[in-house]
């Protein structure tokens, strides 16, 4: 009897998480994605030399600790190429970066997020004021908050890993077949070097 109630509780939680995620994507597509952005995404876009010509990168850092440390290596390699790198990072991860004073940060606090895991209006307005040549979202699993944040920043090129609804947020998507994020980020860096 107890097992059945635990199973139904897990099923209910999974149902509500799925519902919350779908509702979040619906609201994000109607609130944060401008219709002009959607029209522009269908227009042909040249990626020739965009990484070589780019001066500033915003790297949206992942949440898991292992992915975070691998993402720092990725950011370091971009910086070694002479690019100005800013990190979009959650408040609880800032302590890991105190020794990396050569990065600029956009710090995300818990109060910057709604219950549907979307940026609050004030934070979204602040993000719209930011401008970068390239935005790279290093979240491999689905993360609606980071996908929306990557889209709010003023940038011509938005790069992310392929996941559900990613075509709404990124104009360059990388297919990820790796289990280890270090390999995924290395493959992404190799792909970017072609540009």
What are these regions (language model features)?
Residues 57-60, 64-83, 87-88:
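Histidine-anchored nucleotide/phosphate-binding helix
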Residues 2-3, 8-56, 65:
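Short N-terminal or domain-adjacent regulatory/targeting segments
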